[in-house]
Each structure stands twice: as C-alpha cells, then as structure tokens.
Amino acid sequence: MKYIIKENKMVLEKVNKMNLEELLNCIVCPNIVATQEDVTKAYFCFIHPNTYDNMKRKIENITSLNQHKMLFVTDMEAGAGSAIDGATRFPSMRAACEAGDENLAYLMGKAAAYEARKVGFHWTFGPCVDILGNHFSPMTSIRSASENKDDVLKYTAAYMRGLQDFGLIATLKHFPGDGYTMFDQHLTTSCNPLTKKQWDDSYGYIYQQFIHNGVKVIMAGHISLPAYDEKDSNGIYPPASLSYPLLTNLLKEKLGFEGIIISDATEMSGFCGYMNYYEACFAFFNAGGDCLLFAHPTEEFVDKMKEYIASGKLTMEVIQNRAYRMLCFLEEYVAQVNTLPENDKENFEIYANQMVDLSCKIYRDRNHILPIQLDKPLKIAHVVIACQYDFSLIEKFTKQLSSFASV
C-alpha cells in the first residue's frame, strides 16, 4: 500500500511556534564527526559504522542530552553487519540475488531490523535499487542486485519488506538511478544517460512498484537525468538532488511519491561541487526535498538561510512545510514501534551462511578446468584486502570457493 504521511494537528501547532533555527534542526540529518554538541538539537542523526557497544553508547549519550524524540540512522544495505561490528555479516545485495532465494533476502531484512533496533537505530539508508548497467561503475558493483530490473526489484523488495515488517525504516537509493556511468557522485555530478523510454522501463518501473508497495523514504542522488531535465544557465544538467523537474515533476507528480525525500550526503562533490554549498542546500528544499543528509545546523548555516529568506530565494513557508513533514514522519514511527521484534538471532548466522553458500557459483568455465586438480603441489599466496568488519565474511567465501580447487 502506498505510503502517505499522516497529518498531525499537534505537530502543526508545534511547527508554527518554531523559529528558523528550530525549524532547520528538523530538516537536517547531521553525522557525528568529532563532537556531539551540534547534533543534540537535531531530530535526526547519522552514526558512522563502529562497534556494537560504541554505537549503542553514542545513541544513548545523544538521547540523554536531547529534550525531544530522535531517529537514528546508518547505512545497512545488506544486513546490519555492514555497519555494526558485532552484528551478523551478510554478504551483499548481489549475493542475495545470486543465491536465488527471495525468502533469504527477506530474512536478511528481518535480521537487520532486529540487530539495528537493539543498538538503538530506527532507520537505514538501504536497499540500493540501482541497476548494474555498466560493470565499470565505481559506485554500484555488488551493491546492486543485478543487471536485470526484475531481479533488482524482486530481491530489494524482499529486503525492504523484512526491514519494515520488523520496524526499521527503509530508504531506496539512489534516485534517479546509478549504475550506468563510470563517474562517482563523491567526486562529481554523475549522469544517468538513459532515454525517457529506457528510464521508464527500468528505473521508473522499479520506483513505481516500490511506491505502490509502501516505501517511506527515497534518497535523491547527485545524479543528473537529461532525459527528464533541462540544462542550467551554464549549460550543465543539475543533479536530481537540486532539480525541481526530477524531484517534484517526475518523482512526486508522475510517479506519485508522497513520502520523505532525503538528499545523499551534502559533502559529496556531486552536490557541493555543482554550486555553492549553502545555495545548494536551499535549492534542495526548493526542488522538493525534505531533509539534508550530513548538513549541520551551525550558526553559519542558520545565518545563510536567513539571508536567502530575506532575499526571497527561500521562503519560511517551504521550511515550515518540510519541518512539518519530517516531524509527522518521526511521530508516526514512534507511535507505531514500541517493542523489538521476536529474537531469532541464533538463526541469523545460518541465514547469512546459506546466502554465501548459494551465491558462490561458476559463471564461466570455457575449457572445463574446474574443479582444478594438479598432479604436483602448488603454493599459492591468497591475499585479501578488506576492512576488519569484512574478515569473517571473507573467510566464509574463501571456504566456499575452495570447493572449486584443490591445490
């Protein structure tokens, strides 16, 4: 069922009494970098990957310093273990697809919801619903379920159901779709090169199905879509995060999305490299966005927004509307979720191992040399470069891959 933010009279009264600084704290999602001082007034907060105990402690500390309810979020695109060191480490969305078991993708979502909420999280930036249209894409790779739109939809939808059925808010990313370019949004504004028909039949189809099935949040990527947009005064196509034609005309009006639109990180060059940082921030709201990711409500930030309001580039009505939507979203979640889902943790590791086992397969064996059998012993140095959070997962894959060779 399509998600529509519920009206809330008490929230409206609260918003109408807020000053600009208070309103801005409702429509940013700062990340914790060094101190916690500038996030204690915010209503939403991103916590970077860390250990289970450290993340739980941070959330508890911030909550104790705050006078209002908050939602905490992190990146869990394929299970909680990708962000929380100590949680079950599932492989990837690509592995979920290759395993060929839709229920395993659902159970991965269930496991993520339980383990994330146990730490104190309410929300995740996932699943990634990008299509792997270009194998040289630096952003997509195994974050994408497949090159095929139907497989992307099938397995990411199952993961989303698992997340939201057990109380963790899911977020689709990265609208209007990554995976067809060789450029990285962290470094520049990338481009989705598809024609209108190609986009409608692929990403448009995926987002339409998710909207009909209750997705609550969509992340606007720093990706342009020339097929549905026009060049700016400099002859450049803007990223979706700063485009009214893409966020309002396409996503809201054509596709009918009425949930929350959050930007990808504002510190990425695809956003702040396209135009002045503060101008980009107000342009996001004017384009139809609701919440700025990694924006911090500092004194300078507030002063800049005051300047734009005074000049007429931004209005208080827009800020109030976005604050109202975000607080309604928060209150609705808090009212619905009170208890943790059933503890099935002893089975989470089993689900993850099953996904690893099923996803390891032979794609190409032209000369029929697998499994490799050698007459003489051969010493091979197998070096894996990975962060410490991935060590246990790499060991699982290495063990499974050994079935294809005995050397």
Regions found by a protein language model. Give the residues of each.
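Preference for extracellular/luminal or secreted protein segments
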Residues: 1-42, 244, 253, 274-407
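Short, well-ordered alpha-helical
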Residues: 6, 10-82, 128-143
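Loop/turn elements at helix/coil->beta-strand transitions in domains of secreted/extracellular proteins
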Residues: 20-26, 40-44, 66-71, 117-122, ...
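Active-site mouth loops of central-metabolism enzymes
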Residues: 24-35, 93-107, 188-201, 269-275
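Hydrophobic faces of well-ordered beta-strands that scaffold small-molecule active sites
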Residues: 25-32, 43-47, 70-78, 123-127, ...
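Second-shell residues forming the walls of enzyme active-site clefts
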Residues: 53-65, 80-82, 147-318
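Glycine-rich, aromatic-flanked loop segments that form ligand/cofactor-binding clefts
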Residues: 62-89, 105-132, 152-179
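Surface-exposed, active-site-proximal loop segments in enzymatic domains
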Residues: 85-98, 134-145, 184-190
